[in-house]
């Protein structure tokens, strides 16, 4: 399941992030935390986030070839009365605190927690691709690459892959033995709805941010509740139930 935001909406998200001194990654993490909280009905959620691993204090690390990425757990409290803009800044600070563990294996981090070994630490992951393929190649060679499709797989039931650029793309990879196709598609649409709500209501309370788009809300509230029927005037009341 995937969705590509329009250039206008993508630009608005970048402008919002810059204006509120957060990152685009923070906005996506915030929307994902809100979505997980609504689905689980929990005030605290835990999901994985990938880090580059290249901010470590190692001489010459920026010139080293190979993968340094690591996956770290991000625990987020979603208080319904929290102010969105302040909550996002706190989320950014939480990400900054995680940097000290960039080189720490996830299995070691789990050993420090109350989650037993062998039990899933978390069941969803966000992968934010800071270096889109086409932009990197264009800068290096002057060539434009089009029609590229990326496919990936992780061991987590849900993986949100975020591809920034002129048009922000959100791709949700999921295990079909856990989630139906229509459920994954709905989650991606609701994620877009939350992102749009974030840039429109920076001072909103978290609990008031909409999960349904206008058309979906109209269907649920209006169309699905049109259950009125005409009954004969002389019918007994107990027969109308």
Predicted regions and their residues:
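Adenylate-forming
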Residues: 1-185, 192-200, 208-214, 222-227, ...
């Amino acid at each position: 399941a995937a969705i590509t935001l329009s250039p206008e909406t993508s630009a608005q998200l970048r402008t919002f992030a810059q204006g509120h001194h957060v990152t685009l990654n923070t906005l996506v993490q915030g929307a994902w935390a809100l979505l997980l909280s609504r689905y689980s009905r929990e005030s605290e959620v835990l999901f994985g986030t990938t880090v580059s691993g290249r901010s470590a204090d190692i001489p010459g690390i920026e010139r080293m070839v190979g993968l340094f990425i690591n996956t770290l757990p991000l625990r987020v409290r979603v208080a319904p009365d929290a102010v969105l803009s302040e909550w996002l800044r706190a989320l950014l600070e939480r990400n900054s605190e995680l940097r000290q563990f960039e080189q720490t294996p996830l299995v070691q981090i789990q050993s420090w927690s109350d989650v037993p070994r062998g039990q899933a630490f978390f069941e969803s992951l966000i992968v934010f691709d800071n270096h889109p393929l086409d932009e990197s190649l264009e800068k290096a060679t002057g060539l434009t690459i089009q029609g590229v499709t990326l496919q990936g797989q992780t061991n987590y039931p849900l993986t949100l892959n975020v591809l920034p650029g002129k048009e922000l793309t959100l791709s949700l990879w999921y295990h079909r033995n856990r989630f139906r196709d229509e459920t994954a598609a709905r989650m991606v649409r609701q994620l877009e709805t939350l992102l749009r709500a974030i840039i429109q209501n920076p001072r909103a309370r978290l609990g008031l941010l909409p999960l349904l788009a206008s058309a979906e809300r109209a269907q649920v509230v209006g169309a699905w509740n049109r259950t009125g029927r005409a009954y004969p005037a002389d019918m007994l009341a107990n027969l109308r139930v």
